[in-house]
Swiss-Prot record:
It is found in: Cell inner membrane. It is a multi-pass membrane protein. Keywords: Cell inner membrane, Cell membrane, Membrane, Transmembrane, Transmembrane helix, Transport. Disulfide bonds: none annotated. GO terms for molecular function: transmembrane transporter activity. Gene3D superfamilies: MFS general substrate transporter like domains. The chain crosses the membrane at residues 19-39, 56-76, 90-110, 113-133, 144-164, 171-191, 222-242, 254-274, 288-308, 317-337, 376-396. It comes from Salmonella dublin (strain CT_02021853). CDD domains: MFS_MdtG_MDR_like (cd17391). InterPro entries: MFS, MFS_dom, MFS_MdtG_subfamily, MFS_sugar_transport-like, MFS_trans_sf, Mutidrug-R_MdtG, Tet-R_TetA/multi-R_MdtG-like. This is Multidrug resistance protein MdtG. The keyword Cell membrane applies. One of its GO terms (cellular component) is plasma membrane.
């Protein structure tokens, strides 16, 4: 029996990749609460300079990830997804270790760019599971996997803040590197993949990848949907704390209230993603996607009219429950419309669009709030999501008509 004939325990792989995504999500978000403080510690002074450098070191990771993702996706389709998971986890661990040793802002900026270049654990985990899980369970599996990164990202800022308070800023980078190395070890020992390497000559070129897709126009619309989902999420991030302060008035625990309101969508997504993924396996992920987008629009609009932080918290919880279905539904539709041979590249292209959304979303939110106020951000974001819902519905309708 050849290695490629050995049956894969995809359920165990799902469990281990979930742990890997949890650790990666936690590791990335561990350093986020004090990133501006570390920039200041590296010698940047002055309000405008601090804001500029903080924005640069935050966004450059996503920019370089967007550039590098297609390359790593192609390599994953040639060499296998497990080796890409190992490369990502070990590479990020080394970079995080070096970040804790940075002596000036330029070194730190270069390392943040390198982090983006070497990242990609979560999209490769998605590609691995998507190619191993039975098709009729794709929605549930990818929905479950998405909760790993979300739960890690929820826990990370809290743990990072506590660790920074007790041990200082630099040790948190060393702790984060250790977490990523644990992720590397888990992947090395417990994830199994039957993959026959493909020579460079046998690899499909970009045109052949597009030609092999069942519906290239639909796949492109799914990439755009991913971008807009991240734009909608990111547009609110820069103004959330300030908006909560405007609603709450003069209170002493504004940081706690803001942190809670920032985290409730993630908690809701944890609860909803596997359930809605399973529902999508029954009724179709395209229905879940369109309904979740429409619900998001209906929840974003009243956010601009709330009068108390608790009204905002309730609406954001409901929004998180709807949002928990969006990316898994997109990923499931990508699985349905591509082959295992090109899964690495398709998921990496999707990651590039996601990274672009991560950069443009906060910029859009900051620009709108500066010109028209905090409340306008929610209305404009609702308009963007409504456009996405109409665009996605039209793309899916064309696909259905083409099949008929």
């Amino acid at each position: 029996m050849s290695p490629s004939d050995v049956p894969i325990n995809w359920k165990r792989n799902l469990t281990v990749t979930w742990l890997g995504c949890f650790l990666t999500g936690a590791a990335f978000s561990l350093v986020m609460p004090f990133l501006p403080l570390y920039v200041e510690q590296l010698g940047v002074t002055g309000h405008s300079a601090l804001n500029m450098w903080s924005g640069l070191v935050f966004s450059i990771t996503f920019l370089f990830s967007a550039i590098a993702s297609p390359f790593w996706g192609g390599l994953a389709d040639r060499k296998g997804r497990k080796i890409m998971l190992l490369r990502s986890a070990l590479g990020m661990a080394i970079v995080m270790l070096l970040m804790g040793m940075a002596q000036n802002i330029w070194q730190f900026l270069i390392l943040r760019a390198l982090l983006g270049l070497l990242g990609g654990f979560i999209p490769n985990a998605n590609a691995l599971i998507a190619t191993q899980v039975p098709r009729h369970k794709s929605g549930w599996a990818l929905g479950t996997l998405s909760t790993g990164g979300v739960s890690g990202a929820l826990l990370g800022p809290l743990a990072g803040g506590l660790l920074a308070d007790h041990y200082g800023l630099r040790p948190v980078f060393f702790i984060t590197a250790s977490v990523l190395f644990i992720c590397f070890l888990l992947t090395f020992f417990f994830i199994h993949e039957n993959f026959l390497p493909v020579s460079k000559k046998e690899m499909l070129h970009v045109r052949e990848v597009v030609a092999s897709l069942k519906n290239p126009r639909l796949v492109l619309s799914l990439f755009v949907t991913t971008l807009i989902i991240q734009v909608a999420t990111g547009s609110i991030a820069p103004i959330l704390t300030l908006y909560v302060r405007e609603l709450a008035g003069d209170v002493s625990n504004i940081a706690f209230i803001s942190g809670m309101i920032a985290s409730v969508p993630g908690v809701a997504a944890l609860l909803s993603a596997p359930r809605l993924g399973k529902l999508g396996d029954r009724i179709g992920p395209e229905k879940i996607l369109i309904v979740a987008l429409i619900i998001s629009v209906l929840l974003l609009i009243p956010m601009s009219f709330v009068q108390t932080p608790w009204q905002l918290a309730l609406l954001r919880f409901l929004l998180g429950a709807a949002d928990g279905a969006l990316l898994p539904a997109v990923q499931t539709l990508l699985v349905y419309n591509s082959t295992n041979q090109i899964a690495g590249r398709i998921f990496s292209y999707n990651q590039s669009f996601r990274d672009i959304g991560n950069v443009t979303g906060p910029l859009m939110g900051a620009a709108i709030s500066a010109s028209y106020g905090f409340r306008a951000v929610f209305c404009v974001t609702a308009g963007v999501v409504l456009f996405n819902a109409i665009y996605s519905w039209n793309s899916l309708r064309r696909r259905r008509l083409a099949i008929e």
